[in-house]
A protein has these predicted regions:
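Structured C-terminal helix/loop/strand segments within mature extracytoplasmic catalytic/sensor domains
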Residues: 85
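Acidic/polar-rich alpha-helix caps and helix-coil junctions
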Residues: 1-75, 79, 91, 95-310
Length: 313
């Protein structure tokens, strides 16, 4: 269930909250082929399946674990990107705070903790840095000790038992971790985004529409543009056909219209009022939001290059 924030958690989706949705499934279904392009109103522009040899389905084959999924372990995520994802309660991840909360010797999930359901997302032996993170983290990050569904393996002869398997990437594992074959994740962290539970290179990879431009990006652009307007200034912008005009200013209520839609679908609490009020703080928050929301999508790299500060998160 999404985090109980006494805001989004008290409202249904139609009321502006997330109490009746599964943010994890809602987010990953945009990318993993669960929805055909024509069924996905969030896609504003896509090349559909006309992606040639560089399709997203081909990319997913390279993301797959080598032994269990017949993939290549080719795409590693940086630690910086992994750390950017928020905690379930909306706090930023802090390694120093993690070390304080979990003293040495208590940082890996135990059998007893699994049986008690203390960390429902994690298996025994998994590092607790990956516990209690926001839904987009679990939809996007293939962390050490995560589970790959690979459900279509059940329809094969040789790999029918390789379903819902835990995968480790650490040194010394000669299957999906480090090995002398050259087929391993250099960073030790993989990418789960775009992967459907059925996907396996042993059987088939679902076709996936390319999210070239989607509504979430437009919402972020809108909030960013409003944030950069001078305080106290108002601008009249003509409509596309000149029939009317719109008065635009740095309006926090309007900025929220962009951010709150993204945060509630992601299952993460909204920003604080002080974060909306401070232009510089909001700019940094928005950059982080874009980094997370659009991870492994085309727009994010270009956007970060064009932002007016080099202080990238």
């Amino acid at each position: 269930a999404p985090y109980q924030d006494k805001d989004f958690s008290t409202k249904t989706w139609n009321e502006g909250g997330y109490s009746d949705i599964d943010p994890y499934e809602s987010y990953r279904a945009v990318f993993n082929g669960s929805l055909a392009m024509y069924q996905n109103p969030e896609l504003i522009f896509s090349r559909g399946r006309n992606q040639g040899a560089n399709s997203i389905a081909e990319m997913v084959k390279l993301q797959m674990p080598k032994t269990l999924g017949g993939g290549s372990n080719a795409y590693g995520m940086t630690q910086k990107m992994c750390d950017a994802y928020y905690m379930a309660n909306g706090d930023e991840f802090s390694r120093e705070h993690f070390k304080e909360e979990y003293p040495y010797g208590t940082r890996f999930v135990t059998k007893e903790e699994v049986e008690a359901g203390t960390y429902p997302q994690l298996k025994e032996g998994v590092y607790k840095e990956y516990a209690n993170r926001e839904p987009r983290f679990y939809a996007s990050v293939s962390y050490n000790g995560c589970v790959w569904a690979l459900l279509k393996n059940a329809e094969t002869t040789d790999y029918k038992n390789d379903v819902e398997k835990q995968v480790n990437y650490y040194y010394g594992i000669n299957t999906d971790g480090f090995s002398g074959t050259g087929v391993y994740l250099r960073s030790g962290i993989g990418i789960m985004k775009y992967v459907h539970p059925d996907d396996t290179n042993r059987k088939e990879i679902k076709a996936k529409a390319e999210p070239a431009i989607r509504f979430a990006e437009i919402l972020l652009i809108y909030a960013e543009a409003l944030n950069e307007l001078e305080d106290g200034s108002s601008y009249d912008i003509a409509s596309w056909d000149g029939s009317t005009s719109y008065s635009v200013k740095r309006d926090i209520d309007e900025m929220k219209k962009g951010i709150r839609q993204i945060r509630r679908r992601a299952g993460v609490p909204d920003y604080t009022m002080s974060e909306y009020q401070d232009r510089d703080v909001f700019r940094k928050k928005l950059k982080r939001e874009r980094q997370i929301e659009l991870m492994a999508e085309g727009p994010v790299s270009y956007t970060h290059l064009t932002l007016p500060t080099s202080d990238l998160v």
